[in-house]
Amino acid sequence: MSNKMTGLVKWFNADKGFGFITPDDGSKDVFVHFTAIQSNEFRTLNENQKVEFSIEQGQRGPAAANVVTL
């Protein structure tokens, strides 16, 4: 599934490089790894930050991909 979705960052631990996004459509929270963040700067997210992303099947279930801050 590569449809773009929007959501808010629930939490993100910059030291460990991962967190979760709460999709705007009310679906289950989605895991996000820092490597999925599209940025030329330090790849981190802030709590309650608005993002656009797609969902791909990761090793442990659905994971955010191509994450862009809005």
Curated annotation (Swiss-Prot):
Domain of life: Bacteria
Record SUPFAM superfamilies: Nucleic acid-binding proteins
Biological process annotations from GO: regulation of gene expression; response to cold
Keywords for this protein: Activator, Cytoplasm, DNA-binding, Stress response, Transcription, Transcription regulation
Subcellular compartments: Cytoplasm
Single GO MF annotation: DNA binding
Main location: cytoplasm
InterPro entries: Cold_shock_CspA, Cold_shock_domain, CSD, CSD_CS, CSP_DNA-bd, NA-bd_OB-fold
Ranges of residues in domain CSD: 7-67
GO terms for cellular component: cytosol
Expression induction: In response to low temperature.
Matching PANTHER family: COLD SHOCK DOMAIN CONTAINING PROTEINS
Name the record gives this protein: Cold shock-like protein CspG
Organism: Escherichia coli (strain K12)
